[in-house]
């Protein structure tokens, strides 16, 4: 029962600020949550915001609550684990505590010092920006590799081979990610939240968005240049937004599907982890019925699949041609 909140010393809110169709943060979801719990809040309680929020959200929440009920501390402690690695990483990654005062920091320290040996003290705005900066940096990193992929394509060269050459025994290239679909519920959203905060002058992040989101359009153009798309059954392998996940939120696989469905004879989809899409088909059926296969999410289980000599588009450079005798585009 929500009324149980009044008996607790600490309340953790795991709701962030999504973005709307204009790429602006939406605060209404947090406000609705606060409005629901406000009647049950008591003096000296600590509220911890854990999810990604737009800059200065913690300040707004603190003022909003304390204008109605005094003596309630609000801190921002960003969750920074990689999806699928929470149990391992939550104890390894330093926990950031963004607090307005020492009293609030000390309260939060009591809980987070039990989770991790390392705690970093910050202001709420510093903590908010640290989370958004990290996600935006990663998003931009992916866009660089995707831009390299598109440049290689224009030059008629396989980026996978260039990628191997770049990284071969060269430490300064060790962190360059592969090309591939960069989407999901965090990186794109947080990059756009920074742009909104900075008066839409985050040109680097906005260009990264154009590259990452535009990769899908480039692939559809590539198909049209090499095939009569109207006669194609196209199979999409992996509909989750990332490898070895069942999360389809903001997945570029679905953006590609919608684009291809306009012109292709049929678009077939499969994913070993996704359970909520009724249109998914068994992997072998998709391979057998398709004239062209596109690797959208590089699930580990796909590493050994038999592609039966079908033409393949693999932006990730993940699949091997040694066993499949496929033509890669």
Where do the protein language model's features map onto the residues?
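Structural/interface elements that position substrates and couple domains in central-metabolism enzymes
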Residues: 1-329
């Amino acid at each position: 029962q929500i009324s149980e909140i009044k008996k607790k010393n600490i309340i953790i809110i795991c709701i962030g600020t999504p973005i709307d169709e204009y790429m602006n943060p939406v605060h209404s979801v947090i406000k609705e949550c606060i409005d629901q719990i406000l009647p049950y809040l008591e003096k000296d309680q600590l509220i911890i915001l854990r999810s990604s929020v737009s800059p200065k959200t913690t300040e707004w929440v603190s003022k909003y609550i304390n204008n109605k009920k005094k003596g309630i501390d609000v801190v921002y402690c960003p969750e920074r684990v990689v999806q699928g690695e929470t149990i391992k990483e939550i104890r390894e990654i330093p926990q950031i505590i963004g607090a307005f005062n020492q009293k609030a920091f000390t309260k939060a320290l009591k809980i987070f010092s039990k989770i991790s040996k390392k705690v970093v003290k910050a202001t709420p705005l510093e903590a908010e920006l640290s989370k958004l900066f990290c996600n935006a940096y990663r998003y931009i990193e992916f866009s660089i590799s995707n831009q390299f992929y598109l440049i290689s394509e224009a030059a008629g060269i396989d980026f996978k081979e260039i990628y191997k050459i770049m990284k071969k025994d060269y430490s300064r290239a060790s962190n360059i990610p592969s090309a591939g679909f960069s989407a999901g519920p965090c990186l794109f959203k947080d990059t756009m939240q920074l742009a909104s905060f900075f008066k839409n002058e985050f040109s680097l992040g906005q260009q990264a968005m154009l590259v990452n989101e535009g990769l899908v359009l480039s692939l559809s153009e590539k198909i049209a240049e090499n095939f009569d798309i109207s006669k194609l059954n196209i199979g999409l392998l992996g509909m989750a937004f990332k490898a070895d996940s069942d999360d389809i939120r903001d997945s570029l696989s679905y953006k590609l599907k919608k684009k291809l469905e306009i012109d292709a004879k049929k678009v077939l989809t499969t994913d070993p982890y996704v359970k909520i899409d009724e249109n998914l088909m068994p992997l072998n059926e998709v391979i057998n019925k398709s004239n062209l296969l596109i690797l959208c999410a590089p699930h580990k289980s796909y590493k050994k699949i038999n592609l039966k000599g079908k033409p393949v588009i693999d932006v990730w450079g993940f699949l091997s041609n040694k066993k499949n005798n496929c033509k890669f585009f």
